[in-house]
Amino acid sequence: MSKILIRAMVLPMTGPEDFYPEGEIGIENDRILFVGEKGSAPDSFIPDQIIDLPEDVVMPGLINTHTHAAMTMLRSYADDLPLMPWLQTKIWPFEDKMSDEDIYWGTLLALGEMIQSGTTTMLDMYASMDQVAKAVLEAGTRGVLSRGLIGNAPNGERAFAENIDLVKNYHGAGQGRIQVMFGPHAPYTCSGEFLQRVKQEADRLGVGIHIHVAETEDEIKTIKEQYGKTPVQWLEELGLFGGHVVAAHCVHLTEEDQEIMAQNKVFIAHNPESNMKLNSGTAPIPELRSRGVVVGLGTDGTSSNNNLDMFGEMRSAAFQQKLVKGATALPAYEVLQMATVDGARTLGLHDVGVLAPGYKADLISINFDQPHFYPRFSIPAHLVYVAHAGDVRTVMVDGKILMQERQLMTIDIKRVCREVEKRAKGIAQGL
């Protein structure tokens, strides 16, 4: 039994008015026992460790609802291109040369970057997902993993079988830190018959589906030419939306598409920086939220972003909508919800995303004793419009400290950086 008492400014994300300037959090093993003002600890709570962070804001760990972690291997390899030329001429040829070991090291680099920027949970889609699971288990983070499935590719059936094995071997692994979904890539890379088989297996195994949807105007045009419908309408017709589905991007949605998403309770992973960099467009996030659609926030991969800083992603999410929809669009607290509690809902995780009794002890501290955080009129505004990855001081998952005073505790990051540099350059030289 391990008991920890944290003293800090506490933003629990349980409501817009909930903030404890002199707060306390009590943790026993992997769970939160209490959260409140100074003096909240019951007399019976005798901590084994006290962590005093009087100038830090402690909040739930950030949740990245859509990424391709091992694409750290491709960071800065292919820039300044639209989506399809980027994929077809640069990304896919590079990925074809990546080994299982490359994916392991690339994922470990991503996890180190995520921890250092306050992300405790990710939804990942890639290949060699057993290697991704290995990296997640070693790093101590939380991960929802999906094997990327390009149904139209020669290895489509093998990848499908790998996703089934991933569920059987890793769903619930690491004391529940790993969950698994199916990962059909997109409507334009999977046939209707393939998608229906994916849906059938997901239902049989009791897991969700993670898919790119309506990312570009070219995708809309392609699907309309093939099926006479928008991607969202076609996926609904196929029956894909019957269970827990996370749809990434969702940039180009008609009013009917948005209503379909709401009626089917589809969860959306919003990736504003990737959408801007690839010139994909601006997703109708305020409209979707007003219909009751739950929207999480994601970075996408590092070759279309090019980092995994969820603080930067929050700022971009807010600024992009304000530019297009008006200054009142997506207030700071709503963006924080997308990166925490709504991110957890998007991934189907019911015991993370807020700091409250009974929830997992997944939390981060941000060092507010810095010039850019003064004066402190609004903590949520500072977190969204000011904070960046380098402000994160402490990271905890399942009650275990993964970073303290910015020092990673579970990853030898210098070794990982050297290994990724060597491997990535070797692949690029062979192309």
Swiss-Prot record:
The keyword Metal-binding applies. It comes from the Bacteria. Its cofactor is Zn(2+). Binds 1 zinc ion per subunit. Zn(2+) binds at residues 66, 68, 212, 300. Its EC number is 3.5.4.28, 3.5.4.31. Substrate binds at residues 95, 147, 185, 215, 300. Disulfide bonds: none annotated. Keywords: Hydrolase, Metal-binding, Zinc. Pfam families: Amidohydro_1. It catalyses: S-adenosyl-L-homocysteine + H2O + H(+) = S-inosyl-L-homocysteine + NH4(+); S-methyl-5'-thioadenosine + H2O + H(+) = S-methyl-5'-thioinosine + NH4(+). The keyword Ribonucleoprotein does not apply. SUPFAM superfamilies: Composite domain of metallo-dependent hydrolases (SSF51338), Metallo-dependent hydrolases (SSF51556). One of its GO terms (molecular function) is 5'-methylthioadenosine deaminase activity. Catalyzes the deamination of 5-methylthioadenosine and S-adenosyl-L-homocysteine into 5-methylthioinosine and S-inosyl-L-homocysteine, respectively. Is also able to deaminate adenosine. HAMAP family: MTA_SAH_deamin (MF_01281). Belongs to the metallo-dependent hydrolases superfamily. MTA/SAH deaminase family. This is 5-methylthioadenosine/S-adenosylhomocysteine deaminase. It comes from Desulfitobacterium hafniense (strain Y51).
